[in-house]
Amino acid sequence: MSGNYGKVYLVGSGPGDPELLTLKARRLIDSAEVIVYDQLPGKAILDSMPASAEKINVGKYAGSHTMTQAEINEVLVQKAKEGKMVVRLKGGDPYVFGRGGEEAEVLVAEEIEFEVVPGITSAIAVPAYAGIPVTHRESTSMVTFITGHEDPTKEESGLDWETLAKFGGTIVILMGVKMLGRNAEELMKHGKAPDTPVAVIERGTRADQRVTVGTLANIASLAEERKVKAPAITVVGDVVHLHDILGEQRTGVDF
């Protein structure tokens, strides 16, 4: 590592509720010279960025990208080589479908010091705020996380739908709004029961959180009817029934 270079922190900001930001993340944001951010952390966290920091909006949100991933990598490298303390601020956890691993590889190749600061992943926190524990002693002892937005350049899907359909635990799908209907069809086509409970949780952990509950057979039509939009988490499995019992949790913070 070069002694003249700065350092990059890949910081997870959690699912959106600003009070779920870790103490370390808060400290690093407050002391950053440069913050490279997208929209997933949410307005409350973004509004709390220090005025003294240089802020670079890379705009990755719901298919609207101000910069490509390659351009983001270049910014991180450039600012670090200028000797700056850089925070790459991400929603959730940097290493859970956050492309943090790709950014870390680039930093290693450029001999730039970096540190990963884990965040509370939305895959667990968002269902929790909707009254849906992803595991439950009486319902399931297993959970799997999958992406609903694979790399479009892949020749074949990396998802094994046959195995997922047979999986007896909870399936949590991140970034899956656009492909909600296709995902439900794939699970049913490979043997998952059409009446399997499904919940789609929009803007989870935020004051305007909204939950749509249905089944594999009707969730796509319900989502279309309710005009469901990203960001949203989809939960598939028997634990969804607990939403009616455990209720919703809201922050009361408008963000």
UniProtKB/Swiss-Prot annotation:
It is an enzyme of class 2 (transferase). S-adenosyl-L-homocysteine binds at P15, G91, G92, D93, T121, S122, M175, A232. InterPro entries: 4pyrrol_Mease, 4pyrrol_Methylase_sf, 4pyrrole_Mease_sub1, 4pyrrole_Mease_sub2, CobA/CysG_C, Siro_Cobalamin_biosynth, Uropor_MeTrfase_CS. PROSITE patterns: SUMT_1, SUMT_2. Gene3D superfamilies: Cobalt-precorrin-4 Transmethylase, Domain 1, Methyltransferase, Cobalt-precorrin-4 Transmethylase, Domain 2. Pathway: Porphyrin-containing compound metabolism; siroheme biosynthesis; precorrin-2 from uroporphyrinogen III: step 1/1. One of its GO terms (biological process) is methylation. It catalyses: uroporphyrinogen III + 2 S-adenosyl-L-methionine = precorrin-2 + 2 S-adenosyl-L-homocysteine + H(+). The keyword Transferase applies. Keywords: Methyltransferase, Porphyrin biosynthesis, S-adenosyl-L-methionine, Transferase. It comes from the Archaea. CDD domains: SUMT (cd11642). Its EC number is 2.1.1.107. One of its GO terms (molecular function) is uroporphyrin-III C-methyltransferase activity. Belongs to the precorrin methyltransferase family. Homodimer. Involved in the archaeal biosynthesis of heme. Catalyzes the methylation of carbons 2 and 7 of uroporphyrinogen-III (UROGEN) to yield precorrin-2. It does not catalyze the overmethylation of precorrin-2 to trimethylpyrrocorphin. This is S-adenosyl-L-methionine-dependent uroporphyrinogen III methyltransferase.
